[in-house]
Amino acid sequence: MGLKADNWIRKMALEHKMIEPFCEANIGKGVVSYGLSSYGYDIRVGREFKIFTNVNSTVVDPKNFVEENVVDFEGDVCIVPANSFTLARTIEYFKMPDDVLAICLGKSTYARCGIIVNVTPFEPGFEGHITIEISNTTPLPAKIYANEGIAQVLFLQGDEKCDTTYKDKKGKYQAQTGITLPRILK
């Protein structure tokens, strides 16, 4: 399994629409950087957020998630409350090749401010926006800047194709758009 370089990422984005929209340059002046890098792609966070709240005194249950757990927010800057959590989504829409797995790591700019980003792997055959989990681990409110970088995606190509892709197994988050809340197949 090999880590893919910028030339491969560029080709897959431009010729196979693996990343749309695709930013061929790495933009970093005056913003949290985003776009193509040497061995990855820095994704941007969109303007929509779902901020966890205790206003309704609910319990977070991944098997029975209720919308009252979150407050919808749209804007250029999202303030994540102290010791809190928000969901967001990428601006980019991904179409993963059948022999490629992508992993996502938070950007150091945010990590050094106590902002931890979690994204599960993009499985072979997955298509959709990426839902991003953002934790503010500090005792202070923290800003997240929409339309700027939030994490870096690394692409790993397998030595052979898998028997069953995410698309083949009809994954529960396949072709998701916007922010997708937890789902349990029934």
UniProtKB/Swiss-Prot annotation:
Keyword set, alphabetical order: Hydrolase, Nucleotide metabolism, Nucleotide-binding
Top EC category: hydrolase
Coiled coil regions, renumbered to chain: none
Chain positions recorded as dCTP binding sites: K107, S108, T109, Y110, A111, R112, Q152, Y166, Q176
Keyword Nucleotide-binding attached: yes
Active-site annotation: E133 (proton donor/acceptor)
Translocase in keyword set: no
Catalytic activity reported: dCTP + H2O + H(+) = dUTP + NH4(+)
CDD domains: trimeric_dUTPase
Biological process according to GO: dUMP biosynthetic process; dUTP biosynthetic process; nucleobase-containing small molecule interconversion
InterPro entries xrefs: dCTP_deaminase, dUTPase-like_sf, dUTPase_trimeric
One example GO MF annotation: dCTP deaminase activity
Subunit composition and interactions: Homotrimer.
Function, as annotated: Catalyzes the deamination of dCTP to dUTP.
Family: Belongs to the dCTP deaminase family.
Protein name: dCTP deaminase
